[in-house]
């Protein structure tokens, strides 16, 4: 599982090195920088597959710190996928992104959700409406509504909590 609001990449390492470290962790040898190049390069094929899957092929040699914000989120998804989780926790994965990056990350989330459960906290309603099968709306620690987007978005308690009585 991984949360997004704090960047979780090594900014001075390349995209490939970041994913390779995550793969090392999966093998039980995380952050083993002293391994031979041969041993580390054994991970490169799978690392490249993950990099391709998240659309970062053209950034493989770039350091993570050089990546645009949305591409860093894609790298975080790649490093998470390297661990082959059954569930991913995404905390506002599109916060602060441009429209183009939101679309790219939403498509990527849709793709990875096909093979695992994704639990997402998100305030961008267009992202919620396109990605979510089941929605739970919380306000002040209380569950206001649960269901699909249509039923939740028209629920009077949800409308009141998020839009106020003038919109009801």
Task: Specify the residue positions occupied by each region the protein language model found.
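Glycine-rich phosphate-binding loops of nucleotide-dependent enzymes
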Residues: 1-168
């Amino acid at each position: 599982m991984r949360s997004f609001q704090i960047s979780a990449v090594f900014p001075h390492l390349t995209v490939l090195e970041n994913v390779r470290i995550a793969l090392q962790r999966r093998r039980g040898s995380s952050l083993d920088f002293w391994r031979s190049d041969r041993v580390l390069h054994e991970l490169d094929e799978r690392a490249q597959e993950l990099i391709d899957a998240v659309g970062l092929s053209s950034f493989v040699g770039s350091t993570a710190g050089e990546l645009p914000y949305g591409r860093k989120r894609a790298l975080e998804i790649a490093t998470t996928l390297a661990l082959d989780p059954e569930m991913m926790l995404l905390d506002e994965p599109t916060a602060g992104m441009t429209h183009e990056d939101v679309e790219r990350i939403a498509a990527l989330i849709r793709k990875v959700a096909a093979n695992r459960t994704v639990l997402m906290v998100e305030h961008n309603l267009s992202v919620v409406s396109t990605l979510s099968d089941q929605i739970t709306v919380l306000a002040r620690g209380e569950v206001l509504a649960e269901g699909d987007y249509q039923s939740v978005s028209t629920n009077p308690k949800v409308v009141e909590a998020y839009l106020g009585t003038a919109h009801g």
